[in-house]
Amino acid sequence: MTNTAKILNFGRGNFAGQERNVADLDDGYARLSNMLLEAYSGADLTKRQFKVLLAILRKTYGWNKPMDRITDSQLSEITKLPVKRCNEAKLELVRMNIIKQQGGMFGPNKNISEWCIPQNEGKSPKTRDKTSLKLGDCYPSKQGDTKDTITKEKRKDYSSENSGESSDQPENDLSVVKPDAAIQSGSKWGTAEDLTAAEWMFDMVKTIAPSARKPNFAGWANDIRLMRERDGRNHRDMCVLFRWACQDNFWSGNVLSPAKLRDKWTQLEINRNKQQAGVTASKPKLDLTNTDWIYGVDLKTSPHRWLTLTVSRCVGSPTTCRNSTTKSRRYSR
């Protein structure tokens, strides 16, 4: 019996046809501080939130911008997540102050002490997604192990204060994400159309007050949404009446927000309709007993041979005018 051995050739194979995809700084890069990178690594975020966060970093720091207008479709293209899920994760990051929002612009918040990371409370990710996020515990203000946390002070929005129906949720329930919301801050939110109308109104305010401070657009959009859903107004009527108020001599300094527009809607509409009809609210009443108009009249130009002028004057009470005297005079040419 002869011992034979079969030699098998395990070569590296032919990889010449495969395209190598290697990252290179020449293709662009994002400058990120080590402190911020460590903070992101230690933040207890869901996989979806972290993917959206990285996408926002790419669209801002990747272009050397602190903030930029980022649509949900752009986030979906980078994260490979549905547009709706990207919107939900983005708004959650905004509520945690990890992402800043100014109108329709978004960007990373470099002030780590302002971050508010919710507690997971030992729940599974599937359960946690369906429950409310509690913002009681915030990101530590100092590095290292510490029990000191910074609680976020409640900011008072200067809109939606005109009534108790300013929002759809109680003040302490800040977690419910509205699927139709293009902007949301706590329980105040609005659709993309509401936000567009709010930005248009602020542009109108700046025409009469160029130094006006940028408002809380979530509160403005919330007031516009309430006018639309509860008062039955539409965006066109809101903008038309708001523009008239900004151009009116009296109302231009009194109606500078959607909340004020909603509060004064009836008065504004009445005054605008009177103005368009050519009727002013201060029109004097006609005095039927006033005969001052006769003075200075040249009676010789009358086409009649004789002109009889009868003047009735009230002798008794002005309200009753029961007793009266009548004087008749005859004038000739």
From Swiss-Prot:
| Keyword match Transcription regulation | no
Read off the Gene3D superfamilies from this record. Answer: Winged helix-like DNA-binding domain superfamily/Winged helix DNA-binding domain
Its annotated function is as follows:
Necessary for the bidirectional replication of DNA. It interacts with the ori (origin of replication) region of the genome during the initiation of replication.
Task: Give the gene symbol.
Answer: O
Stretches with biased composition (Basic and acidic residues): 123-132, 144-159
Species of provenance:
Escherichia phage lambda (Bacteriophage lambda)
Output the Gene Ontology terms for molecular function: DNA binding
Task: Enumerate the Pfam families for this protein.
Answer: Phage_rep_O (PF04492)
Q: What is this protein called?
A: Replication protein O
This protein's source sits in the domain of life called: Viruses
Could you confirm whether the keyword DNA-binding appears in this record?
yes
Record InterPro entries: Phage_lambda_VrpO_N, WH-like_DNA-bd_sf
Q: Where are the transmembrane segments?
A: none
Give me the ranges of the annotated region Disordered: 117-181
Q: Name one GO biological process term.
A: DNA replication
User: Which keywords does this chain's UniProt record carry?
Assistant: DNA replication, DNA-binding
List the biased-composition ranges (Polar residues): 160-169
The entry's family comment says: Belongs to the phage O protein family.
